């Protein structure tokens, strides 16, 4: 019995350390997948790249990172549900951003940009985040 009481703190510590490692690793994998998808999308010469989208990056400075990811995900969802172009790539990007945001939100910004500019800005943000991960 004495050995069991000594092992409990060690096991708890190992579980905590493992969960932190896995969480950080998941962050890397998700970001890599997002950046890869954004590289593919921004390299395409497609008429859909000129579609007008809500510029969620023009939101107030006090907007959290999760809110920005959530809004970007909402914009992407609107695009691939109403247009047939690049549907699988945009839906995958939406899914990954949604998992990082882990919340629901609405988009109310009036400022617009093109899909290409939106994706380029998102790629820059994700590369910055990846460099810190």
From Swiss-Prot:
Q: Can you tell me which residues are glycosylated?
A: 62
Which residues fall in a coiled-coil region?
A: none
User: What is an annotated GO biological process for this record, any one?
Assistant: cell surface receptor signaling pathway via JAK-STAT
GO cellular component annotations, sorted alphabetically?
extracellular space
Among the Pfam families in the record, one is IL4
Going by the UniProt record, its keywords in alphabetical order are: B-cell activation, Cytokine, Disulfide bond, Glycoprotein, Growth factor, Secreted, Signal
Subcellular location, in the record's words?
A: Secreted
- Which GO molecular function, any one, fits this protein according to its record? cytokine activity
- Disulfide bridge positions per record: 27-133, 48-85, 70-105
Tree of life domain: Eukaryota
The primary site where this protein sits is: secreted
Signal peptide range equals 1-24
Entry's family note: Belongs to the IL-4/IL-13 family.
Summary of the function given for this chain in its UniProt record: Participates in at least several B-cell activation processes as well as of other cell types. It is a costimulator of DNA-synthesis. It induces the expression of class II MHC molecules on resting B-cells. It enhances both secretion and cell surface expression of IgE and IgG1. It also regulates the expression of the low affinity Fc receptor for IgE (CD23) on both lymphocytes and monocytes. Positively regulates IL31RA expression in macrophages. Stimulates autophagy in dendritic cells by interfering with mTORC1 signaling and through the induction of RUFY4.
Indicate what this protein is called per its UniProt record.
Interleukin-4
Gene that encodes the chain: IL4
């Amino acid at each position: 019995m004495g050995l069991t009481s000594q092992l409990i703190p060690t096991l708890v510590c190992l579980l905590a350390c493992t969960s932190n490692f896995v969480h950080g690793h998941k962050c890397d994998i998700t970001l890599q997948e997002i950046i890869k998808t954004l590289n593919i999308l921004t390299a395409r010469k497609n008429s859909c790249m000129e579609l007008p989208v809500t510029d969620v990056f023009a939101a107030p400075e006090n907007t959290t990172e999760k809110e920005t990811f959530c809004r970007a995900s909402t914009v992407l969802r609107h695009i691939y549900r109403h247009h047939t172009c690049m549907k699988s790539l945009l839906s995958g990007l939406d899914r990954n951003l949604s998992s990082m945001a882990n919340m629901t939100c609405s988009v109310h910004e009036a400022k617009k940009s093109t899909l290409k500019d939106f994706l380029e800005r998102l790629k820059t943000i994700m590369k910055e985040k990846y460099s810190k991960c």
